[in-house]
Amino acid sequence: MLHNRMTTAFERSKEQEHEAAKNEIPSFQVFIERRDFLGAITVLKFLKSTRNTAEVGNADLWIAYCNFHLGRHEEALEIYTALKKSKNPPLDAHTLDLYRAICMLYLGQMGDARELATTLPPTPLSNRLLFHACSRLLDEESLVTYHTKLRNVSADQMALAAVHFLRTHYQQALECYEEVLQVQPECFAIYMHMALCYYKLGDYLKSEEFLMLYRENAEDSLTSLNLYAATKFRQGKMAEALKILEELQNDETIVGLPIFKHNKCLYTEMNAAVHILPPLVGIVSEARQNLVKLYIEKGQYEDAYKVVQSFEPAVSAEYTLKAAAYAYYGQTVQDMAVLQYAQAAYSTVGQSDADRDTVLGRRAMAAAYFLTGEFEEASMYLESIADIPKESEDSFMLNYSLCLAATCKVTEALERLMSVMGSTNFTPVHRTWLGRLLIRAQRSAEAFDLYRDAEKNSLQTILLMKVIANECFAAGEYQYAERAAAILVDLDKASKDHYIMIQKACIAAMELIRRGKTITPPELVYETE
């Protein structure tokens, strides 16, 4: 009985200790180890308010650290500046200035960060900071100087990888990450960086593979969930992407983030995008790109042009974005200066050492040749990437088809163009080219069928029928030429050329009949009221 009572008392004591431990507030170090920086700030501010900071040291220094890791770089900068001005700074002035310079770098104040860092004694950390700042300021000479001072240690290799990434040298960045992993395999956060590199390279399956490795250690990471949804979206799995995003909707802090608003808009087929995307330009990196794409899809080329007109591109994707907006707008208003800029921007990307052998670089070079009417060269570049899976496969196929058509490769051009007839990017221009190719492939009846689906009494339809009339006449299909000219008489009453075409087609057809050839008139496809 005594033993039982002692056991019961002991168990009750352990339960009370366990309950007390549950109710005990964790130390700020525990919060930091969990990367719960908000929790750490709360504890630190409480300790500071109760003047119980003996075990903490300088609470403000830790609060600045937590703010920095929360992305609150301005708050961190203010604290470091205040600490430097205080009577008894917790660190020497050089260290505090270095921390201030790092905050400036993250705030985009590259010039200020560089100016401050160059006044400090050289250290590996200051060298990495200056290496980054010079990269962003495009100071190549200084960049090389700081590059030579990088050591073969993990921190410097990570800095080098970051600069490679910013310059879209994703393969080189991956090589740096692999080197670091060989030395420090426990750095699972590198898997996230590698996943992002593969995403940028368009290898979405490989990106998912590294994301899974990362999420084994950080399942609740917003960044990884966002990237995972993006890989699904790029693979055309819209529903899966939206489902992943919806899992985060219960968190009010996440729902309010610009990146969440942007991606939800993107995954819901750009519903209300015209209202959601403009305020996000300059905040979310892809917002400008998607807004320009939206305007181009809607045929609002002037709006697309205005979005990028004052924007200075820094990386290849930004150059091609601005080039596309300029190309569409320049062709619409027939402005050669705008078109020349588009051609030059495409050439810059296509001829660069970093991009010349990538899908982006080859498409850019093809576009540059396309704008100058050098379709043979454009076709050669497009052919080299024809079998590689691409994000905008329809747009690629339409452009490739036109290049093939312009170089008289009728059969191949026709096959590829017909495969994307249902695309939202299939325009009246493509329909007209399809009609031309069908006639050249001796399928005039099918070319005539295009008129059935065309918008009646529009300028595009008149152009289509003119092409059909002229191509049929050139191909000796005089009955179709006559019928097309007859329809043009109804559509374009102001022109007398169509009557002449009817006369010529009828005379030519009668001559063929006289020679014994049987001519079958085309079916009536449209009667004006």
Swiss-Prot record:
One of its GO terms (molecular function) is intraciliary transport particle B binding. It is found in: Cell projection, Cilium, Flagellum; Cytoplasm, Cytoskeleton, Flagellum axoneme; Cytoplasm, Cytoskeleton, Flagellum basal body. GO terms for biological process: intraciliary anterograde transport; intraciliary transport involved in cilium assembly. Gene3D superfamilies: Tetratricopeptide repeat domain (1.25.40.10). Component of the intraflagellar transport complex B (IFT-B) involved in flagellar assembly. This is Intraflagellar transport protein 56. InterPro entries: TPR-like_helical_dom_sf, TPR_rpt, TTC26. Keywords: Cell projection, Cilium, Cilium biogenesis/degradation, Cytoplasm, Cytoskeleton, Flagellum, Repeat, TPR repeat. The keyword 4Fe-4S does not apply. SMART domains: TPR. TPR repeats lie at residues 57-90, 154-187, 189-221, 285-321, 359-392, 428-461. Residues 11-21 have a biased composition (Basic and acidic residues). Belongs to the IFT56 family. It comes from Giardia intestinalis (strain ATCC 50803 / WB clone C6) (Giardia lamblia). The keyword Metal-binding does not apply. Residues 1-21 are annotated as: Disordered. Its main location: other. The lineage of its organism: Eukaryota, Metamonada, Diplomonadida, Hexamitidae, Giardiinae. One of its GO terms (cellular component) is 9+2 motile cilium.
